[in-house]
C-alpha cells in the first residue's frame, strides 16, 4: 500500500530513486523481506521506479534488522530485478566491520547509490580510518554512473571537506 501511494509522488518529483529502510524488529527477517521485495518487484518494474535498500549499522541504529552488505547483496540477487538495488553506505559498513572493496567490485551492478562519511565519527572523509581516495578511485574504475551522497557531519566548512574528490 505504501509503495503504491508513494509512486505518484516519486513521479511528480521526477526522482531517480526511492531509498527505503527495512525495519527495526524481528519480524523483518530475510524471508519476510524477500516476500515483500518480490511483491514490490512487478510494481516497480511496471512503473519504472527504482527502490534502493539501505543497510544501516546496528550500533548507531540499535535493532536495525539488515545491517550487513553481504546478506543484502545475496537477497537482491534472489529478487533479481533491475529496479531493486542497494545503497552502499561506506560509513555503515565500516562501523559493522563489513566494508570490502571486493563487495563493491563484485556487486556494482546492483548498487544504486553510495553514501560517504568517515568512520568512526560520521564526519567528513579524512577524519577517520576510511581511505576514501582509494575507494572513490576504485568506484570510478568500475564505471559507476550513479550518485555518491555526502552524508556526514562536517567539522569544518564544506569547501575544506571535499578534497578527497579531487575537484
Positions of predicted regions on the chain:
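Active-site acidic/histidine proton-transfer and metal-coordination neighborhood
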Residues: 1-85, 95
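Histidine-acidic metal/acid-base catalytic patches
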Residues: 8, 14, 50, 66-88, ...
Amino acid at each position: 500500500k505504501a509503495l503504491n501511494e508513494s509512486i505518484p509522488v516519486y513521479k511528480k518529483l521526477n526522482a531517480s530513486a526511492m531509498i527505503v529502510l527495512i525495519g527495526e524488529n524481528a519480524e523483518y527477517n530475510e524471508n519476510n523481506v524477500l516476500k515483500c521485495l518480490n511483491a514490490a518487484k512487478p510494481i516497480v518494474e511496471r512503473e519504472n521506479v527504482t527502490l534502493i535498500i539501505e543497510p544501516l549499522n546496528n550500533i548507531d541504529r540499535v535493532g536495525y534488522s539488515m545491517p550487513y552488505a553481504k546478506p543484502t547483496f545475496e537477497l537482491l540477487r534472489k529478487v533479481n530485478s533491475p529496479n531493486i538495488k542497494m545503497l552502499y553506505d561506506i560509513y555503515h559498513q565500516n562501523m559493522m566491520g563489513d566494508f570490502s572493496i571486493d563487495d563493491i567490485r563484485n556487486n556494482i551492478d546492483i548498487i544504486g547509490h553510495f553514501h560517504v562519511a568517515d568512520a568512526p565519527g560520521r564526519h567528513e572523509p579524512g577524519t577517520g580510518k576510511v581511505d576514501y581516495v582509494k575507494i572513490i578511485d576504485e568506484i570510478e574504475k568500475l564505471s559507476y554512473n550513479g550518485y555518491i551522497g555526502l552524508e556526514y557531519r562536517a567539522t569544518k566548512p564544506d569547501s575544506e571537506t571535499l578534497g578527497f574528490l579531487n575537484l
